[in-house]
Amino acid sequence: MESLPARLFPGLSIKIQRSNGLIHSANISTVNVEKSCVSVEWIEGGNTKGKEIDFDDVAAINPELLQLLPLHPKDNLPLQENVTVPKQKRRSVNSKIPAPKEGLRSRSTRMSTVPEVRIATQENEMEVELPVATNSRKQFSVATGLPRPSCPAMTELPLSMVSEEAEEQVHPTRSTSSANPARRKSCIVKEMEKMKNKREEKRAQNSEIRIKRAQEYDSSFPNWEFARMIKEFRVTIECHPLTLTDPTEEHRICVCVRKRPLNKQELAKKEIDVISVPSKCLLFVHEPKLKVDLTKYLENQAFCFDFAFDETASNEVVYRFTARPLVQTIFEGGKATCFAYGQTGSGKTHTMGGDLSGKSQNTSKGIYAMASRDVFLLKSQPRYRNLNLEVYVTFFEIYNGKVFDLLNKKAKLRVLEDSKQQVQVVGLQEYLVNCADDVIKMLNMGSACRTSGQTFANSNSSRSHACFQILLRAKGRLHGKFSLVDLAGNERGADTSSADRQTRMEGAEINKSLLALKECIRALGQNKAHTPFRESKLTQVLRDSFIGENSRTCMIAMISPGISSCEYTLNTLRYADRVKELSPHSGLSGEQPIQMETEEMEASSNGTSLAVNFKEEEELSSQMSSFNEAMSQIRELEERAMEELREIIQQGPGWLELSEMTDQPDYDLETFVNKAESALTQQTKHFSALREVIKALRVAMQLEEQASKQMNSKKRHQ
C-alpha cells in the first residue's frame, strides 16, 4: 500500500464510485500524499466535475493497481485440489446500479466531496473482517490462469493487460476494502476525533475550575455561584458614582433610577445584590438564568437613564438632580410633576416622604419637605418678592379610582370637568402655609391617613397614589403648581397575600393608572397633539401638568437589589425605559458589550422558549382583556349606584317634613296626600333604577370572578 502513490500520477484514468453507487472512469488531476487522497475530474452533461478520493477507495475500486504490488506470503499459497472455482461470466457491473437522478445531472456546480467519501469510511469502520479477501484473490489468480510473477517483472507490464479482468473483480475487492478494520481513517474522522478529545479536555478543565472556585466560596451560601459570577463581572467595569459635585442637567422629561441597599429581611435570607451602577447614567441587571442542562449563567442587561443613583446616594443627592431643578419652573408660571415609581418596599415613600421608623416617618428628610424649603427660599428672593405670591398645599390620595382628601378627614372628592374643559377636584381643601414647618405638619397629618395594605414585598405597602401639591397663587390666581406623587406599588394581583375582589380591583386600577401615566408622559415628551389623560383618575387630576409648553416632569424609578426581586426590578426598569427610551450605547464605551453572558446560550432552546412564551402571552392577553372589561363595568355601575343612592338620600328631608306635618292638629289632609303621592312617585323611580343597577352590578361581579379564576388556573398550569 505504501507504493500505491508512486503508481498514481496526473492524467491517469481510474474508476471511481459516486455517492449514488454509479461507477465510471475519471482522470487524476492531482495527487496529495499528505492527505492520502487524489483529486479526479470527469465530464458529465457538458460540465466538468470533480471530487477527492482516498487512496483506500482508489485501491478498492481499482484492484489492478494492487496486483502490481508485492503480495503477502499468504497470497502465494497453492490452491487446494478439492476446491473448484466456478467460471464467472463476463458481465457489466453497472447493470445493477440505478441511474443517477435528473437533479444530479443538471447540477453545474463543483461537487462537494466530503459527504460522499466519509459515509463509506464510517461504515467500513463498523464492519467486521470477512474471509472474502482471500477468495477474491484466489479467483483472480485462477481467472488469469498464469503463475504470479515477481514484482520486477510486473512493474514493466502496462495497465491494459489487467484492465479487462478488473471489471469483474470490482464488487469482491470493494468488500475486501470494506472488511479491513485496519483501514486508514479519513481526514474528517480524524478532525472529529480531535474535536472530541478537545471537548473532553475542556470539560475536565472546567470541572477542576469549578472545584477550585467552590473551595474559595462558601457552598452552603445560597446562590454562591451567581454571586461569584457577579463579582467577576464587576471587576471588569469601572465605577464612577454620582456625587453632589456633578453638574445638573435640565430636561423636559427626566427619568432617573435609584437603587436601595439590601434591607434586613434580604440580609437575613442571604440574598445577593444583582444590580450594578457603574456610572451616573448606566445600570446593569445581572439576571440569573438556567440552561436546559441546568447550567447556571448570567444575562447582564444594560439600561441607560438620565441619572442613576446607587445604594450610597442620600435623599439630598437624589433631590438635587431630580426635583430641585423643577422648583424654578413653578416660579416661572409653569407646571412641574415629580413621580416616584417602583415595587413596594423599593423606597418610594422613603424618597418622597422621608425616613421611616416603623409606622412613623421623619418627613423633614424627604423630597416633599426639601421642595417646600426651596419654594420659600426662592419666594424670599428679590426677583420674586414683587409677585406677592402665596403658598398653598393640598394632599390627597387616589385609591381604586376614588379620590380622598388626606387633610380633611379623608373626605371623598369628585373629579369633574367644568365648562372650560378644566378638571376640577370638587371639595379639595387648600391650606395656606407660611413656612416649611407648616408644610411638615401637613405632611405628617396626611401620611397618617394614607391607605396601606399587605403585598408580597412589603407588609405595610402603600396601595394608593399619594399626591402632594404646592400651589403658588398671586391675588387668588394660580401662578404655578408643583405636584409630587408617590405612586402605588406595581405588584401584580397574584403577588399579594390575599386574592379577594378588593385586592384584584386594587391591582387592576393601579396598573391601569400606571399605563395611562406612561402614555401621558410619552405624549408630553413627543409633543403629541392628543394626551390620553382621561384613561385614569390619576392622569385626570394631573391633566394640567401634561399640557402646555412650560410643563416639566421627572420620574424616579425605585428598584430593589435582591435576587428575589429581580423580575419586578426588570419590570420597573422597562417601564421607565419606555417613558423616555434612551439607548444604553450612550453610556457605554465601544469596548463594553451591552449584554454579556458567562456561558454560551443555547440558541435553539431559547428560540423555542420564546415561541412558547409568546403563545402563552397571547392566551393570557385575551383573558386579561375580559378581566379588565369586567372591572371597568363594575366601576361604572358602582358610580351609577352611588348616584341613585344620593338621589334617594336627598329625598329624606321630604319624608321628615311630611311626618312633622301630621304632628300639627289642624294640618291639611289634601296637601299631605298630594305631597306623599309625589314623593312616592319620585322614590319609586329611584328605587327601580337602583334595583336595575344593583342587578347589573351583581352580573358584572360574577363575570369578574370567572375571568379571575381563568387567569389563575392558566398561571398555575404554566
Curated annotation (Swiss-Prot):
GO terms for cellular component: cytoplasm; glutamatergic synapse; kinetochore; microtubule plus-end; midbody; nucleus; postsynapse; presynapse. A motif (Microtubule tip localization signal) lies at residues 95-98. Changing S112A: Increased frequency of metaphase figures. The keyword Nuclease does not apply. Keywords: ATP-binding, Cell cycle, Cell division, Centromere, Chromosome, Chromosome partition, Coiled coil, Cytoplasm, Cytoskeleton, Kinetochore, Microtubule, Mitosis, Nucleotide-binding, Nucleus, Phosphoprotein, Ubl conjugation. ATP binds at R258, G342, Q343, T344, G345, S346, G347, K348, T349. Residues 1-248 are annotated as: Globular. Residues 613-651, 689-716 form a coiled coil. GO terms for biological process: attachment of mitotic spindle microtubules to kinetochore; cell division; establishment or maintenance of microtubule cytoskeleton polarity; metaphase chromosome alignment; microtubule depolymerization; microtubule-based movement; mitotic metaphase chromosome alignment; postsynaptic cytoskeleton organization. InterPro entries: KIF2A-like_N, Kinesin-like_fam, Kinesin_motor_CS, Kinesin_motor_dom, Kinesin_motor_dom_sf, P-loop_NTPase. CDD domains: KISc_KIF2_like. Disulfide bonds: none annotated. Phosphorylation by AURKB, regulates association with centromeres and kinetochores and the microtubule depolymerization activity. Ubiquitinated. Residues 252-582 form the Kinesin motor domain. SMART domains: KISc. One of its GO terms (molecular function) is microtubule motor activity. Residues 201-232 are annotated as: Negative regulator of microtubule-binding. It comes from the Eukaryota. The modification Phosphoserine is found at S3, S19, S92, S106, S108, S112, S163, S186, S513, S626. A motif (Nuclear localization signal) lies at residues 409-412. In complex with KIF18B, constitutes the major microtubule plus-end depolymerizing activity in mitotic cells. Regulates the turnover of microtubules at the kinetochore and functions in chromosome segregation during mitosis. Plays a role in chromosome congression and is required for the lateral to end-on conversion of the chromosome-microtubule attachment. The microtubule tip localization signal (MtLS) motif; mediates interaction with MAPRE1 and targeting to the growing microtubule plus ends. This is Kinesin-like protein KIF2C. It comes from Cricetulus griseus. The gene is KIF2C.
